[in-house]
Amino acid sequence: METAHPPMTTGRKLLGLLGWLALCFAAAAVGGLASVDAGSFYAQLDRPAWAPPGWLFGPVWTLLYTLMAVAAWLVWLQGQQRRHGHAPHTRAALLLFLAQLLANALWSWVFFAWRNGALAMAEVLLLWCLVAATTLVFWRVRRLAGVLLLPYLAW
């Protein structure tokens, strides 16, 4: 006989959100360690006219990491609301999210710390594919979660 799980408490939901925020901003910190001298390096690059100014990266990435965390939290909540914990599709969606988050943190190291432009280009293409796939699977689990990743995909 199957037993029903009690509904998730507000406290547990908030702890989940804090956990996803902490994870996303930990990835940001890992990337940030590689980007300590990024300002001077970025200023020296030959950039197209449409490239954003260096000062814009901090505010934009703060917003993007927050949106990523909320999107992952919504998918996690969806999985938690299933009768037996995470449904297989929410687990797969969250694993894909973690893969793109790792690729995101790695890119700063490849480009800013190791200054390997060719590898950074290949890695950013992989990252974009991972973000696109994550956006799609998040959309299928919970539409709002997919929508929240669209600015990240566009950036």
Positions of predicted regions on the chain:
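Membrane-interface helix termini and inter-helical loops of multi-pass transporters
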Residues: 37-49
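Short aromatic-rich membrane-water interface segments that cap or initiate transmembrane helices
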Residues: 47-60
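Helix-adjacent hinge/juxtasegments
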Residues: 66-108
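Membrane-interface helix caps and helix-loop-helix hairpins in membrane proteins
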Residues: 109-119, 140
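Interfacial loop-to-transmembrane junctions
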Residues: 136-154
